[in-house]
Amino acid sequence: MAGKASGKAVDRLAVVDETQADRQTIEVYELVTRKVRVGRVPLLFKALAAEKALMPCWAALRPAIRVRAFEEAADDLRAKAARLAVDLGCPLIETQLEWAGYDVDEIDQIRGQVDIFHYVDAKLLMAVCVLAEALSGGVGGVARGPRGEQRVPRGVPHDMDPIELVPEDANGTLAKVFRSIRMHLGLGLVPDDFRALGRWPKYLDLAWADARKRDDEPVARAALNELGRSADDAAAQLPVRVEIQEAALRAAGADPARVRALLQRFRRALPGLILDLALFKVQLDGAESARESPFPIRWKYISSDEYTTVGLDEPVKLRAGDPKNLDEDGGLPHRTH
């Protein structure tokens, strides 16, 4: 149920791919994948890099994106999208895929890719809402207690499949679907979600066509608005205060007006992407599975020492035997030279 763009020609979104990025950008990209917990750099951050806004935006966003309150807000958005998808009606699709010639292993591979983007798109909408408000005076900073400020584990989940993308300049049925996606989303290019699912052209054609049947229904438009409002509300309740000064953008070489316009493009597109992927997930695995995070964090098994946030201005409590400065060896044996 991707957010529908106007019928006019859409300018292609400028991005900086990894092969074009300088060393500093690559370093930020690596941090992004670890903190967002996904195997490829999301399109949002490549587009920010093209506007020379990646460094200040990531510096502001990073403290918020790494806390439990952010992760759980994205979980809530994902669950809401699944409920809205069920309300729109989305019959199970596995039988159609078998008729299309896909075997069990191929359907599992499709499921693995749907899980990735069903997981990450909700986090990206949260990130966009945080950044947009951060540029308009600031957002967040609501006291939530130590639970909300607990750190999210770093790194890609071990059970997340690799992401393999097909080229955008596809042929045949896939080329037709990709043209529709470019126009429909208002980004002028095909997001990674659909380039990953493009490995199975018949599936993507079926799923995309089915999702588009609902676009003009009032309940579908209301669902998109509800997802956007929910993300805005969740961003406002984060425990970490996020602000971006226009001077910081200009110092990095970015135009604040262009950065705002970029964020608005993603703000329009992402509620629909979230709803589309929720539809795809419900069609594959049913409503109950779609409401759950595909890559849940087992918080009770996480070491509080490693993942509990300590404020920058708070003294760090040392344990017995911890070194108090760099000159102390902490009781370690001296190396023999």
Model-derived features: positions:
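Hydrophobic alpha-helical segments
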Residues: 1-337
